[in-house]
UniProtKB/Swiss-Prot annotation:
The active site is at residues 417, 470. Keywords: Carbohydrate metabolism, Glycogen biosynthesis, Glycogen metabolism, Glycosyltransferase, Transferase. The gene is glgB. GO terms for molecular function: 1,4-alpha-glucan branching enzyme activity; cation binding; hydrolase activity, hydrolyzing O-glycosyl compounds. Gene3D superfamilies: Glycosidases, Golgi alpha-mannosidase II, Immunoglobulins. Pfam families: Alpha-amylase, Alpha-amylase_C, CBM_48, GlgB_N. CDD domains: AmyAc_Glg_BE, E_set_GBE_prok_N. Belongs to the glycosyl hydrolase 13 family. GlgB subfamily. This is 1,4-alpha-glucan branching enzyme GlgB. Catalyzes the formation of the alpha-1,6-glucosidic linkages in glycogen by scission of a 1,4-alpha-linked oligosaccharide from growing alpha-1,4-glucan chains and the subsequent attachment of the oligosaccharide to the alpha-1,6 position. InterPro entries: A-amylase/branching_C, Branching_enzy, GlgB, GlgB_N, GlgB_N_E_set_prok, Glyco_hydro_13_cat_dom, Glyco_hydro_13_N, Glyco_hydro_b. Its EC number is 2.4.1.18. It catalyses: Transfers a segment of a (1->4)-alpha-D-glucan chain to a primary hydroxy group in a similar glucan chain. GO terms for cellular component: cytosol.
Length: 738
């Protein structure tokens, strides 16, 4: 090398900068690498650790713009390639031990972010941030590749690493957008299917564990933890008519009967393999449609490393789990659900996240997504971390995620998990383990604001969708609109009803008279919220056994109790939710590691419960009185529940306009109630449309025939009455003929 070259004014001579660059610890690599205009002309600087030589070439002719000088043994090259400062199109040619290869220079491509996107990201108000952050395959200047972008404001350096660069953090050190904290780079040649993570150096120089992409759209099949380049799901949707008309399908006046399903254990192949999304559509949808459920609710589909969490400890909020297929496969599953007339609700977990090293925990070396103080940021019940809802960027990340599932996957609603843990700062904490809010109270004001903002965005941008709160306290106005001071959810799980009624049903019939109010208490508050009655997965795990296993008595009585209870539930005010397996009275506790016990359907007693659920869904949908006023006090009247000694309940459901009333009589003792007179709103013909004791369901067939004639004899404060045979451990449903 000549002395003149040594003294070239365009050379980078700062050994500290070069040392930081080759060590992969330079905060702003774009300030050094790539083409740079100088007084002497166009200088090109390249870092390629494996190369012996480097030169810039014309991509069309292959002619050389000039060889680059190797300035550092670890692969830093530099050279003046033109006296002109205009940047030509070029490629890089490298050699190593006789091998030659060409590649594009990632550092010649400018940022693809617009000023508005950067402003909204910086403000934490970008509701479609998933269109900018994450991995997006695209073409820049005619070159195919992938743009990677991630939020890590406290990092001193971020690189994207993957199988496209041998997981070498020196190769693709990213561009920082100052003041916003977003790092970005376009990597030529990176394509869908490539694995990647982010290699991050914290503010104090510490190298963090490689991180999966918080906005990654696909992940490796667990237990592997890398993100997969996929881009936003591409789908030719065929559900336009469904989406256009779904406003009435998710409304509080609509019949909503939800089949809760864990996709990994509903059915499996004989060798234990999961069904794919397509196979689930082939087998699950006809089954659900035949049973008459209006919706399925999928336990969390967001990617999660630990199957034993059932999805409630997600790491990849933007990625449908790869256990069952690709993002496009999941989109097709939703599309097929809609084609069959079935709505799709997914469980969504914004309350907390796991502490897995590859996840969000201390993402950039600081408590970025969580709180630093464990009194705010750590959940002892689940050993998980709690989102910092007061940080605008974090709240935006979550709100955008909620909208993402509705926008990109056309889901019809979100069931928000563990809302109670979000609302209260002292949730599951002892004195001294929590910090009061600014008013000295225990409400998490930041979480409340986040939920209101998310629900407002959801209903505003996707009319006809809904949100459902799993909320176990008496927090007021959960399903009240935000403009009326509520949290803005569409519905709330009625946990109180579930606990009270299951407690009642577990008592031996002879003792139920002492717990009579367990079945009536729920009507005191039944219309304070838009309630869903949930018999969810939580009731068949952790040693609770199965629903049928919690019923008292011998085998016949257990089934009779369950049938009577289901009939009570389906005719009680509130939308319905039943966890898979309950529809045929699975006897063992649910196990996420294996499929349901489908052989039960060969047993007439189990098949009878299955057929009862089908008929309950049918009358629930067909009789407006059973669903139109689920959430209104005008839709329910007690006829008689005044005699605890016989454990009977008689009530009426009403609809709007000319809807015919429905009268229900329940007997929760094993004694046949002959000549059981009930009051009715009018005389005439009343028809028994369902009897849980019907022999078709495995009952003793104490029924009332097709029709029941009434008399004008007043009873129970009603102008007419009828005499029934009330079956043992049975419920009867009557409708008045016009």
């Amino acid at each position: 090398m000549s002395a003149a070259a040594d003294a070239a004014p365009w050379r980078l001579d700062d050994p500290h900068v070069i040392g930081a660059l080759v060590a992969g610890r330079l905060a702003d690599p774009f300030a050094i690498l790539g083409p740079h205009q100088t007084a002497a002309g166009l200088v090109l600087r390249v870092l390629r650790p494996e190369a012996d030589t480097a030169e810039a070439i014309d991509p069309d002719s292959g002619s050389s713009y000039g060889k680059l000088l190797k300035r550092h043994a670890r692969g830093f090259f530099e050279g003046l390639i033109s006296k002109n400062t205009a940047v030509p199109r070029y490629r890089l040619r490298f050699t190593r031990e006789g091998d030659t290869w060409d590649e594009e220079d990632a550092y010649r491509f400018p940022s693809t972010f617009g000023d508005l996107d950067l402003y909204l990201l910086g403000e934490g108000r970008h509701q479609r941030l998933y269109e900018k952050l994450g991995a997006h395959p695209m073409a820049c200047d005619g070159v195919d590749g992938t743009r990677f972008a991630v939020w890590a404001p406290n990092a001193s350096r971020v690189s994207v690493v993957g199988n496209f660069n041998n997981w070498d953090g020196r190769r693709h050190q990213m561009r920082l957008h100052p003041g916003i904290g977003v790092w970005e780079i376009f990597v030529p040649g990176a394509k869908p299917g490539n694995l990647y993570k982010y290699e991050i150096i914290g503010r104090n120089g510490e190298l963090l564990p490689p991180k999966a992409d918080p906005v990654g759209f696909r992940a490796e099949v667990p237990p592997a933890t890398a993100s997969v380049v996929n881009g936003l799901p591409q789908m030719e949707w065929g559900d336009g008519e469904w989406v256009e008309h779904r406003i009435g399908k998710n409304d509080r006046k609509a019949p909503i009967s939800i089949y809760e399903v864990h996709l990994g254990s509903w059915r499996r192949h004989e060798d234990g393999r999961y069904l794919s999304y397509d196979e689930l559509a082939d087998r699950l949808l006809p089954y659900v449609k035949d049973l008459g459920f209006t919706h399925i609710e999928c336990m969390p589909v967001s990617e999660h490393p630990f199957s034993g969490s059932w999805g409630y400890q997600p790491v990849g909020l933007y990625a449908p789990t790869s256990r069952f297929g690709t993002p496009e496969d999941f989109a097709r599953f939703v599309d097929r659900c809609h084609h069959e007339g079935i709505g799709v609700i997914i469980d969504w977990v914004p309350a907390h996240f796991p502490s897995d090293a590859h996840g969000l925990a201390r993402f950039d070396g600081t408590a970025l997504y969580e709180h630093e103080d464990p009194r705010l940021g750590f959940h002892r019940d689940w050993n998980t971390l709690i989102y910092n809802f007061g940080r605008r960027e974090v709240a935006n990340f979550l709100t955008a995620n909620a909208l993402f599932w509705l926008d990109r996957y056309h889901v019809d609603g979100l069931r928000v998990d563990a809302v109670a843990s979000m609302l209260y700062l002292d949730y599951s904490r002892q004195p001294g383990e929590w910090i009061p809010n600014k008013h000295g109270g225990n409400e998490n004001l930041e979480a409340i604001a986040f939920l209101r903002e998310t629900n407002t965005a959801l209903f505003g941008s996707h009319p006809g969708t809904t949100s459902i709160a799993e909320e176990s306290t008496a927090f007021p106005g959960v399903s009240r609109p935000v403009y009326a001071g509520g949290l803005g959810f569409g519905f709330k799980w009625n946990m109180g009803w579930m606990h009270d009624t299951l407690d009642y049903m577990q008592h031996e019939p002879i003792h139920r008279q002492h717990h009579h109010d367990r079945m009536t208490f729920g009507l005191i508050y039944a219309f304070s919220e838009n309630f869903i009655l949930p018999l969810s997965h939580d009731e068949v795990v952790h040693g609770k056994g199965s629903l049928i296993g919690r019923m008292p008595g011998d085998r016949w009585q257990k089934f009779a109790n369950l049938r009577a209870y289901f009939t009570f539930m389906w005719t009680h005010p509130g939308k319905k939710l039943l966890f898979m397996g309950g529809e045929f009275a699975q006897e063992r506790e649910w196990n996420h590691d294996w499929q349901l016990d489908w052989h039960h359907l060969d047993d007439p007693m189990h098949r009878g419960v299955h057929d009862l659920i089908r008929d309950l869904n049918r009358i629930y949908r067909s009789e407006p009185a059973l669903h139109e006023l689920d959430c209104e006090p005008e839709g329910f009247e007690w006829i008689d529940a005044s005699d605890p000694s016989i454990s009977t309940y008689v009530y009426m459901r009403k609809g709007t306009g000319g809807a015919r009333p429905v009268v229900v009589a329940c007997n929760f003792t094993p004694v046949v109630r002959e000549n059981f007179r009930i009051g009715l709103p009018n005389a005439g013909i009343w028809r028994e449309i369902l009897n849980s004791d019907d022999r078709r369901y495995g009952g003793s067939d104490v029924t009332n025939g097709t029709v029941t004639a009434t008399t004008d004899e007043p009873w129970h404060g009603r102008p007419a009455s009828a005499i029934l045979r009330l079956p043992p451990l049975g419920s009867v449903v009557l409708v008045g003929e016009a």
